[in-house]
Amino acid sequence: MPAPPLVLASASPRRDEMLRLVGVRFAILHGNVDEAPRAGEAPEHYALRLSEAKARAVAAMRPGHWVLGADTIVTIDGELLGKPATRDEARCMIRKLSGREHTVITAFTLFNSEQAKVIRQAVASKVRFKEIPDDELEWYVATDEPYDKAGGYAVQGKASFLVSEIHGSYTNVVGLPLCEVVEALKELGLVSFRGK
């Protein structure tokens, strides 16, 4: 019996592209979840909770399918940096990251409403930005790239020249820890590289 199909519970074009890059076949469907952090919630727990909520929301619409939910967050000095809504918020976030190291955590959950198994994992990467001169900061903020990105930047996009170091998984910083996700998909029989 063939493995049940995979559904990606995300509208992220970056997650879509990364999974396709390694030959994973999947459908895309995303649901709405409350993304507000809870008081005192640790960043890793927050990311794990959201990834599972996203997976469960879509699994309710696709019983019997494995659903992959993911969430990426950026933290510095214990502060969670979400997605900036305005140019001023983006400017403030990038300025806060300038010349400093921060943590990017991506959590993922694989869930099937008809199975007893749930796979959840959070992966952390450290990213250091160079000291960003005002003219480069203003140029980047004016590109409008920051607005749908945790921490206000896309490491694979126009902000790539701001990054001086990455320790850990690059794909995790992009939005999906591909090594860990593929291993989990292999464990569930949802992807195989034999005979390809």
Name the predicted role of every residue range.
Residues P2-V24:
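N-terminal beta1-alpha1 ligand-phosphate binding loop
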Residues P2-V7, E41-K196:
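Anionic-ligand binding patches
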Residues A11, G31, S113:
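Cofactor-binding loop segments of dinucleotide-utilizing enzymes, especially the Rossmann-like FAD-
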Residues E17-L21, R38-A39, A60-M61:
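Short loop/helix-cap segments at secondary-structure boundaries that form the rim of catalytic
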Residues G23-G40, V118-A124:
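Short glycine-rich, Thr/Ser-proximal phosphate-binding strand/loop in the N-terminal lobe
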